[in-house]
């Protein structure tokens, strides 16, 4: 499977979030063998929990799926650049490959960190299906305002 394939899965999760009135961000964590360990979207409204971001929920679900707290052999696909909280959790989980759709110049981790918060050996790919990822979140906020 390709990065675009898994990012499309994350986009599906983002659309699910939008349909539920949540900020439309989706995340998918894939194991080294290509298996889907977790597919989540933001649930901050439904759970009344400011930490219930797609990445946080996916990290918890993937860790439970493999029975370990470190996700070193996994790849995270996320539709929008992680916020500082999620970026720190990604670093703590030691995810070694992070694939990001759209940048977030207002709230993304790059606005807060001079250095990457991710594991030192992490590979970060940005811009996979960026236009599609940006459109989902832009359309959501355009409709709400």
Language-model segments: what does each one mean?
Residues 25-34:
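Short beta-strand scaffold segments in enzyme catalytic cores
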Residues 68-80:
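Immediate flanking context of iron-sulfur cluster ligation sites
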Residues 37-44:
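Short beta->alpha transition motifs characteristic of CBS
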Residues 46-57:
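A short, polar/charged loop-to-alpha-helix boundary motif
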Residues 1-20, 36, 82-145:
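Zinc-dependent deaminase
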């Amino acid at each position: 499977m390709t990065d675009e394939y898994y990012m499309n899965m994350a986009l599906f999760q983002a659309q699910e979030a939008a349909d539920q009135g949540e900020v439309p961000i989706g995340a998918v964590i894939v194991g080294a063998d290509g298996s889907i360990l977790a597919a989540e979207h933001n649930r901050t409204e439904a759970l009344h929990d400011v930490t219930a971001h797609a990445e946080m929920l996916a990290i918890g679900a993937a860790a439970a799926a493999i029975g370990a707290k470190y996700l070193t052999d996994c790849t995270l696909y996320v539709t929008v650049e992680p916020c500082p909280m999620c970026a720190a959790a990604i670093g703590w989980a030691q995810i070694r490959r992070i694939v990001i759709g759209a940048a977030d110049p207002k709230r993304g981790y790059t606005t807060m960190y001079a250095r990457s918060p991710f594991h030192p050996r992490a590979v970060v790919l940005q811009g996979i299906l960026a236009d599609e990822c940006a459109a989902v979140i832009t359309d959501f906020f355009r409709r709400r305002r």
